Every structure is written in structure tokens, then in C-alpha cells.
């Protein structure tokens, strides 16, 4: 089963009769708040916006709709719709009631001097802490920037299977590349999904190579809605979220 499908099905089981109270599609992030007060975030791929007067082909407002309806947007190829679906799922899944491990993801990972590490998405604050501790750190982005030692995503096919540790941006769930990336990490000792868009749910990832989920739990919904509406990113809302980690466990099954 595709991971997006499993994520949709799992979140729909929690949605019940919950409805969308508020939604903001910002330049950097998308926020969805449910009528129980819970809020979820997901990255906005602004460069995927097309011309026209509306993001969605509808004359109806989104606020007030059932959460289950927004989760069905996981079936869409539209990256903005996918972000709305993931933000809705995160509002349902990223609850403060779980037993999380606090702190940065890098503190939860054991690196060795001979490790080759693949990082999908340039998490620049983590690079300085990882590169001196390992043999090689490969950074992959949609656009290669060789002057900054950043490789194109096509190079993951060759290099990711050689890595012992993989750090994958959760935006791969939004753009649909997550399944292929996980298939390339089947031999990794540790696979971490990280970023603000990360859905914190063991059930979704328990049959994949993923060993750790690193994301956020909203603690000030009003502040987050304001920041997203104003086009702000992670520096602007870091006081309104808790950065947490959820341990999945060792990889016991290959990802199919």
C-alpha cells in the first residue's frame, strides 16, 4: 500500500465528525485547524501554483467542511491540495498526548566515522553537526547546486542505497516521492523522516524502513495561524510549536 494511502486511511479513522475550523494556505506553510482546536502544518510548494483566481476548482469555502473530505485530497496530484491533506492529517495525528522524545532529531541518531549519510532536503542547521562525524554526507535537492555540494534528486538512485543513514524531508509525502525514496533506503541502519510536515504516527510507518519521526506539535494555534497567513516560516513560529521525536524502531521489514 502506498504510504499516502495508508496515511489517509489512518487519519480518517480518527477524523470522526470533526470539521475544519480554519485553514490558511501561506507562502511557506499551510495550516489546518479542526473544530476541536488541534492544528496541523505542512509545507506549501508555492512554485506549483498555476494561473487563475483560485487554488481549488470549487466555489465553496473550505472552512466548515468535514476533515475526512480534506483527507481525500491525498488522492490529488495537486501539490497544494496534498499540502492541505497532510496538514489535516497532522492536526489529527500530531497530538500532545503521545510519549515523545524532545529535542533535535540529530541527537537521537548514532553516527559512526565510516557512515555514508543521505539527506533529502537541505537541512542546513543539521549539516555542520553531521558532516564532521561521518565519512560522507550527500545532500539532495530538486535543483542541483554543485557549488554548494548539493546533488540533484536523480542521484538518489545511485547513492542512497549505499548509505547507512538517511534523513528524508517529510515534504516527500506531499510531492509523492516518499515511496520510491523509502525503497532506496531498505538497507539503511537508520531512516529519519523530519521537518514541520512530518506526521507523527507509528502505525503509518511501522512496516517501512523508517526508525524515527521528527516533527512538531502545535502549542499556540492562534500564533501559528497568524505566522502562516503572513508568509512566515519556521523561525517565526518556533515558539508556537514543540519539536519532538517519535521512535519507530529498527527496520525489520523491507519496504515494498
Predicted regions and their residues:
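C-terminal functional extensions of proteins
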Residues: 192-256
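Structural motif
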Residues: 118, 165-169, 192
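Electropositive, gly/pro-rich neighborhoods at or near active sites that engage anionic ligands
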Residues: 1-131, 228, 244-256
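A short helix->loop->beta-strand "cap" motif at the edges of active sites that frequently abuts
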Residues: 134-135, 186-190, 210
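NAD(P)-binding Rossmann-fold cofactor-contacting core
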Residues: 134-147
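A short acidic, amphipathic alpha-helical/loop segment
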Residues: 129-130, 177-184, 204
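Short acidic low-complexity segments
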Residues: 103-108, 150-162
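Conserved acidic E/D residue at the C-terminus of a beta-strand in Rossmann-like folds
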Residues: 121, 140-143, 195
